[in-house]
Design a protein with these regions (language model features):
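Non-heme di-metal
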Residues: 1-137
Length: 137
């Protein structure tokens, strides 16, 4: 597999992972709202907003590059538990950082590399702060 093709395949995989991440935070935010914890729900909704933004940016960039994208209908929400959400979320965010760091940059065009770096920066903030609103509109 060529370097460019490998990089695009990894971004397609990252797109599916971002979809899963949105489902993860959406479920947790709903649980927090049901538990009456408005502050936690807001925090989780901030993370959800960032992950949705990552998904949108990856989708848009891949489509701009002419990539035919697989549907995301089959991506399922992972199991969630509000009681230990921070530990699970931090590990999931670490996985996202590792995923984006592993994408070979040398074969990416400048704009795609910029999008990747912006997402990676937000994911690094998520690991340390577990809060959202790190993405620029």
């Amino acid at each position: 597999m060529s370097g460019a093709r490998d990089a695009l395949e990894r971004l397609i995989e990252a797109r599916a992972a971002e979809k899963e991440q949105t489902l993860f935070y959406r479920a947790l935010a709903g649980d927090a709202e049901a538990a009456g914890d408005a502050e936690l729900a807001e925090r989780l909704n901030g993370l959800l907003a960032d992950e949705q933004h990552h998904l949108s940016r990856l989708t848009a960039r891949l489509l701009e590059l002419g990539v035919t994208l697989p549907p995301l209908d089959e991506v399922e929400a992972p199991a969630t538990a509000l009681a230990d959400w921070e530990e699970a979320a931090r590990e999931r965010e670490r996985q996202e950082v590792r995923r984006y760091e592993s994408v070979p940059r040398a074969q990416l065009d400048e704009r795609t590399a910029e999008v990747l770096e912006e997402i990676l920066e937000a994911e690094r903030h998520h690991v340390t702060a577990l809060g959202g609103k790190w993405m620029n509109a």
